[in-house]
């Protein structure tokens, strides 16, 4: 009898341990599921898009610029507004496009009719090595310039100027997909010139833009009054 009692007690203890382990395992699954839902709701592409959409709807271009910026690449609010204005001019609903990407493929790119890459969603780091984070990304313009002017120089910003080689293609580097005002200086046969010029992303194709600055000779035709051409 004592042996039977001890066996029964052992079986009861074993069952209690199993129940405890299963309960602990179930609780752990619930915790992990909750954490998974929490982090997916705070790191998913919809969260990133929502922040940008909110800034766009409030016309907070400074915040838009902050979202578009990275540690090595900073946008200004003027550039951010220019990019949004360009997409509007091309009848691109950036809010709809990004939301569609976030809900379907999670990553993707918004393009225009000329195959310019404008804005997109891409994978970033993984939180705790598990939960995928996403970020808004932009794509630069690769700009070149050609000119027939002598001693040409193009001032692309307050701190940057580039000497343009005559009758050659000069690389100006990569810039944000946004309009910008620039200053062109050079020489022609009749003397020095200095003119304000504009970088217009609408002229770009496949994220490449070539700026042409040429002086042209034109024949000027003048008609004089009859009394001037036939003096008496």
Q: Model segments located where?
A:
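Structural motif
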Residues: 142-153, 223-230
């Amino acid at each position: 009898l004592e042996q039977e009692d001890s066996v029964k007690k052992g079986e009861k203890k074993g069952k209690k341990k199993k129940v405890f382990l299963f309960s602990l395992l179930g609780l752990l699954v619930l915790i992990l599921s909750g954490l998974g839902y929490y982090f997916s709701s705070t790191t998913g592409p919809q969260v990133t898009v929502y922040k940008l959409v909110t800034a766009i709807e409030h016309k907070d271009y400074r915040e838009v610029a902050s979202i578009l910026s990275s540690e090595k690449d900073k946008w200004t609010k003027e550039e951010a507004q220019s990019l949004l204005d360009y997409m509007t001019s091309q009848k691109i609903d950036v809010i709809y496009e990004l939301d569609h990407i976030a809900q379907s493929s999670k990553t993707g790119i918004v393009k225009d009719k000329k195959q310019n890459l404008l804005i997109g969603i891409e994978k970033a780091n993984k939180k705790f090595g598990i939960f995928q984070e996403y970020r808004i990304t932009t794509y630069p313009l690769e700009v070149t310039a050609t000119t027939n002017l002598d001693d040409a120089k193009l001032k692309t910003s307050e701190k940057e100027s580039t000497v343009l080689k005559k009758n050659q293609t000069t690389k100006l580097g990569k810039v944000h997909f946004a309009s910008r005002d620039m200053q062109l200086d050079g020489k022609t046969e009749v003397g020095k010139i200095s003119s304000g010029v504009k970088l217009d992303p609408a002229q770009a194709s496949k994220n490449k833009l070539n700026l042409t600055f040429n002086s042209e000779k034109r024949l000027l035709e003048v008609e004089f009054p009859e009394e001037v051409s036939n003096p008496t």
